[in-house]
């Protein structure tokens, strides 16, 4: 993991920033990040703007055995990118199961919720629909498709790899609108590029009924405090 983790910013991010600039597009990608001064690694999602600006989100709390590899996020919690379509933020995998972490993004007015993850099950599909409705935002579900043959042949522990199912992670990438409806159905058991046109007026329309951090909130009763650094 250490040898394949990248320093941010670094040569790899320069290439990605150039790609975003050349395409005139926003880019979101997950990486294993290495601190430039220490040996600590982070499970990280990066945003690149069309101007090449980098926005870094480190996973707040690694899940289960991930803690053997990655550390806790230590700064700049819950960053959002200001896009022409509203604030865009990300939660990595099971971060989305943390209600207060979701609320921290909702408080920033997030309209585009990006989630890189490896949750290839029906329960996760229920979760992302709930979040799209709860935050009245578009949920971009980026789910890994990964087979046993994807592992490099020279990787150690081949005996353990041989015991894995042929399809280690079945995918399930999809896009959900602010009402919890699929704009693109989950893609299972294959690689694919998914895309959709997003009607951003749905965000405002849906929030007229339920605005989780606005008119449907009770800040005099319930309050979230984020100890950011």
Please name every model-derived segment:
Residues 29-31, 44-47, 79, 141, ...:
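Short beta-strand scaffold segments in enzyme catalytic cores
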Residues 133-140, 146-147:
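Acidic, glycine-rich loop-and-strand cores that form catalytic or ligand-binding grooves
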């Amino acid at each position: 993991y250490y040898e394949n983790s990248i320093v941010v910013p670094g040569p790899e991010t320069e290439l990605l920033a150039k790609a975003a600039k050349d395409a005139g597009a926003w880019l979101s990608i997950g990486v294993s990040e290495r601190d430039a001064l220490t040996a600590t690694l982070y499970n990280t999602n990066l945003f690149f703007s069309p101007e090449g600006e980098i926005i870094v989100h480190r996973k707040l709390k690694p899940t289960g055995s991930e803690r053997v590899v990655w550390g806790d996020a230590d700064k700049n919690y819950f960053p959002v990118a200001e896009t022409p379509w509203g604030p865009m933020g990300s939660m990595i995998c099971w971060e989305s199961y943390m209600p207060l972490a979701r609320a921290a993004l909702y408080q920033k007015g997030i309209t585009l919720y990006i989630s890189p993850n490896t949750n290839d099950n029906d329960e996760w599909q229920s979760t992302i629909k709930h979040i799209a409705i709860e935050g009245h935002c578009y949920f971009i579900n980026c789910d890994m498709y990964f087979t046993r043959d994807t592992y490099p042949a020279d990787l150690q522990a081949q005996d353990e790899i041989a015991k894995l199912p042929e399809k280690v992670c079945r995918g399930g990438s999809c896009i959900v609108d602010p009402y919890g409806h699929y704009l693109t159905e989950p893609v299972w058991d294959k690689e694919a590029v998914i895309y959709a046109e997003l009607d951003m007026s749905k965000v405002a329309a849906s929030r007229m009924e339920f605005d989780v951090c606005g008119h449907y909130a009770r800040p005099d009763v319930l309050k979230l405090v984020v100890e950011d650094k």
